[in-house]
Amino acid sequence: LKKGKDFYMVGGMGHASSVALGVNIAKKKVICLDGDGSILMHLGSLLANSINGNNNFKHILLNNNSHESVGSFKTNVNNINFKLLIKSLKYKNYFKLNKIEKADFIIKKFLQSKGPSFLEVIISEGTIKNLSRPKDLKSIKNKFMKSLKTN
């Protein structure tokens, strides 16, 4: 992550890919990190991403089958076949990472792909102890907006 070029969706769960799409439409390379709980909240944005995202739109799903940041409630996304969903929504590429030994290969292929591209990463439940949320949200927003204007 690059300071000022990354943007945290604090308190806006489900909106990360919509913000990423807006940046991407302006011809910027975008990598959106999303959680399974977040994606469930705005499934319709996946279609908007696939239709409007360009070759530089990359969407990563961190899938632990849990709303980790709000109490570890189950999302039950293990009942969703994301490969079928993503392909039916016309993303150009779908990748899945569920074995660490394949991480370098799959991530390289994902980043080199012409998008919109989607990578589902299967992760285990668990949070970092004492993980804090960013405090100065206005400053983060301003730095992010400034970086969009300069690049």
Predicted regions and their residues:
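Glycine/aspartate-rich loop-and-adjacent alpha/beta segment that forms the canonical ThDP
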Residues: 2, 112-151
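Conserved thiamine diphosphate
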Residues: 73-109
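Short, well-ordered secondary-structure micro-motifs
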Residues: 1, 43-44, 70-73, 107, ...
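Hydrophobic anchor at the start of a short beta-strand
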Residues: 30, 57, 93-94, 116-117
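A short, flexible beta-alpha/helix-coil linker loop
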Residues: 64-68, 126
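Active-site-proximal loop->helix
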Residues: 43-52, 69-85
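A short acidic, often aromatic-flanked loop/helix-cap motif at beta-alpha or helix-coil junctions
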Residues: 14-15, 100-105, 125-127
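Thiamine diphosphate
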Residues: 1-64
